[in-house]
Design a protein with these regions (language model features):
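Membrane-interfacial loop-to-transmembrane alpha-helix junctions, especially the N-terminal start
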Residues: 10-13, 72-82
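Membrane-interface helix caps and helix-loop-helix hairpins in membrane proteins
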Residues: 95-104
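Short aromatic-rich membrane-water interface segments that cap or initiate transmembrane helices
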Residues: 38-52, 161-168
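C-terminal, well-folded lobe of enzymatic/effector domains
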Residues: 104-168
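Alpha-helical transmembrane segments
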Residues: 9-22, 84-85
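Alpha-helical transmembrane segments and their helix-start/interface "positive-inside/aromatic belt" motifs
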Residues: 2-15, 126-135
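Alpha-helical transmembrane segments of multi-pass membrane proteins
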Residues: 17-33, 142-148
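Hydrophobic cores of alpha-helical transmembrane segments in multi-pass inner/ER membrane proteins
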Residues: 17, 51-64, 110-122
Length: 168
């Protein structure tokens, strides 16, 4: 089955992306160790939750790439929106965590960024620079899952002991 219209592809991909993100959150406790555990959010830090804006859209676009020109072309076009969505999730997530302890704000941000990422992935032109940035961000997610730096985006909001040295 090929879906020709961009809106139809979006209508297929958006719930799939949200479902994949929900599965990632559900698997968080049972698969928290090892390489696969590095793909899942390990805690409620903005960096870890930004994995929801990175891995589910990539997986969704890879799974549905036949509908829009094959895996290579689809992921090349999607590189910039996915990188920007994940970085915006980390940045605005850090701001949201500092302003409110509500995870609903972060989840709403994730839903909006997932929709924007998938919509832009249909229209963006591919570039090797964005593909390299996509790979670098993926490597950073793996690296910082095991040894995160002591910076606000990487710290769990409820961890007062970790946040104390950062306080002015």
């Amino acid at each position: 089955m090929t879906v020709k219209e961009p809106f139809s592809r979006f209508a297929l991909r958006f719930p799939l992306t949200l479902g994949l993100g929900a599965v990632m959150l559900l698997l968080h406790d049972s698969l928290a160790s090892g390489l696969f555990g590095a793909l899942l959010p390990r805690n409620a830090s903005a960096w870890e939750l930004s994995k929801l804006a990175f891995f589910p859209p990539l997986l969704c676009l890879a799974l549905t790439s036949r509908q829009s020109g094959g895996p290579g072309a689809t992921l090349r076009r999607a590189a910039a929106p996915v990188v920007l969505g994940a970085l915006l999730m980390a940045g605005f997530g850090t701001l949201a965590v500092s302003l409110t302890a509500e995870t609903a704000a972060i989840m709403l941000l994730w839903i909006v960024l997932a929709a924007l990422t998938l919509a832009l992935a249909e229209r963006w032109q591919g570039s090797p620079v964005w593909t390299v940035l996509l790979l670098a961000l993926g490597a950073a997610y793996l690296r910082f899952s095991f040894r995160p730096p002591m910076l606000p985006p990487f710290l769990e909001p409820g961890d007062v002991a970790a946040m104390a040295p950062i306080a002015w």
